Curated annotation (Swiss-Prot):
Protein name according to UniProt: Probable GTP-binding protein EngB
Role of this protein: Necessary for normal cell division and for the maintenance of normal septation.
Organism: Phocaeicola vulgatus (strain ATCC 8482 / DSM 1447 / JCM 5826 / CCUG 4940 / NBRC 14291 / NCTC 11154) (Bacteroides vulgatus)
Residues annotated to bind Mg(2+): S37, T59
Name of the gene encoding the protein in the UniProt record: engB
Family per record: Belongs to the TRAFAC class TrmE-Era-EngA-EngB-Septin-like GTPase superfamily. EngB GTPase family.
Keyword terms: Cell cycle, Cell division, GTP-binding, Magnesium, Metal-binding, Nucleotide-binding, Septation
Amino acid sequence: MEILSAEFVVSNTKVEKCPQDNLPEYAFIGRSNVGKSSLINMLAKRPKLAMTSSTPGKTLLINHFLINKEWYLVDLPGYGYASRGKKQVEKIQQIIEDYILEREQMTNLFVLIDCRLEPQKIDLEFMEWLGENGVPFSIIFTKADKLTNGKVKDNVNKYLKKLTEQWEELPPHFVSSSEKKTGRQEILDYIDSINRSLKA
């Protein structure tokens, strides 16, 4: 699949205010500073589609982008911002949970993981929560350009091994670099395969 058009549609904090046209939605989420906005811009080939910032946690809304007039790419608020007050953290968490659990159009959730880091408790707990709630998700390991290919492979394998402690069957996973465009086609082809299966 190639992206021919990508346009911003709406930002909000309420699931009921999301688009009502029943197109499939692919949501992206991750911890602070995982490279989510850069990944979204890389996938869409639009450098400024999603707002990037050196300040973690700028995405505080559910952002819908219409892709090829066929499906939505959804940029969700991130989780795990230690610098935020308790009330704001709880508010963001509620926005995330409401969308993930109530949005029937969400076809797949991409969980972004910084491949440079050891498995983080907050990510593992979040994925466990997704599993408990039957949420279909995939993993995208980001920032692969920051390490050698061998180190990326080692870190990803270590992460997947950690997941096997909780999971009998591992979710699909991808390795990406927004700088080098690594993983772009694989992720888009995966989305395309799901879209095709929905039409079958």
